[in-house]
């Protein structure tokens, strides 16, 4: 079972961990929310340290920079590829081909600029109000969305790509276990405050549903890029939803 944690750590982070990968990569999906918790705590700690400067904009920038470095920017890369493929291609085949191209196009650049702009604005307010729990919650829920999409959707490519090994064996139990982990973390981090929990879950549901429906329409399934993009968009939407409560 712990080999799944090793695979999850190696897939989602730059952290080097001992041990061997799981024979079935889908077993790592159970651990995605816990890896998200580790990333969230590290980034929230950096945000707290950054606030020693009394400059929330700088603290928010530390969160974004650490997120990129800790994850090798694989999820941001997925969002850029998704934007290029979904909005630059005319057919399913052309979209998949564009998404596989390592070059970043104009749609990808625009998507990344908007993503980091929205994240930075939201994080600036979050750290200014000392609401670090939102940083952790957004990162955990973003990994949970990846589990859901990998489990309920088919793989869009013909048996190729890194994500194929995760999607192939994914199913309902992966969602159930990941959901329990995510909900437990959310309740503890949010200190059982009902409204913030509901708002965060609604933002997650909206992000995951929209990404899934768009992927189903454009390429009839998911790829690693779709899973990465879903993570980035969920983080952004959860953090932006925090603003509703901060200014409520």
Curated annotation (Swiss-Prot):
It is found in: Cell inner membrane. Its cofactor is Mg(2+). Keywords: Cell inner membrane, Cell membrane, Cobalamin biosynthesis, Magnesium, Membrane, Transferase, Transmembrane, Transmembrane helix. The chain crosses the membrane at residues 32-52, 60-80, 103-123, 134-154, 170-190, 195-215, 227-247. GO terms for molecular function: adenosylcobinamide-GDP ribazoletransferase activity; cobalamin 5'-phosphate synthase activity. GO terms for biological process: cobalamin biosynthetic process. Its EC number is 2.7.8.26. Belongs to the CobS family. Joins adenosylcobinamide-GDP and alpha-ribazole to generate adenosylcobalamin (Ado-cobalamin). Also synthesizes adenosylcobalamin 5'-phosphate from adenosylcobinamide-GDP and alpha-ribazole 5'-phosphate. This is Adenosylcobinamide-GDP ribazoletransferase. It comes from Prosthecochloris aestuarii (strain DSM 271 / SK 413).
């Amino acid at each position: 079972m712990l080999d799944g944690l090793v695979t999850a750590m190696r897939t989602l982070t730059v952290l080097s961990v001992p041990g061997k990968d799981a024979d079935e990569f889908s077993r790592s999906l159970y651990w995605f929310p816990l890896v998200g918790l580790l990333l969230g705590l590290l980034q929230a700690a950096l945000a707290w340290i950054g606030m020693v400067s009394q400059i929330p904009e700088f603290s928010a920038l530390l969160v974004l920079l650490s997120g990129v470095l800790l994850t090798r920017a694989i999820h941001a890369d997925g969002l850029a590829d998704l934007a290029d493929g979904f909005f630059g291609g005319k057919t399913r085949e052309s979209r998949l081909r564009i998404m596989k191209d390592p070059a970043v196009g104009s749609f990808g650049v625009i998507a990344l600029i908007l993503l980091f702009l929205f994240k930075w604005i939201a994080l600036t307010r979050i750290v200014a109000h000392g609401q670090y729990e939102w940083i952790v919650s957004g990162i955990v829920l973003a990994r949970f969305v990846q589990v859901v999409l990998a489990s309920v959707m088919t793989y869009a490519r013909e048996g190729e790509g890194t994500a194929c090994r995760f999607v192939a064996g994914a199913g309902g139990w992966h969602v159930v276990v990941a959901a329990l982990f995510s909900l437990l973390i959310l309740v503890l981090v949010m200190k059982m405050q009902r409204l913030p929990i509901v708002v965060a879950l609604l933002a997650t549901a909206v992000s995951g549903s929209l990404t899934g429906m768009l992927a189903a329409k454009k390429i009839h399934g998911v790829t690693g890029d779709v899973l990465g993009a879903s993570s980035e968009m969920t983080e952004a939407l959860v953090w932006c939803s925090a603003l509703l409560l901060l200014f409520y």
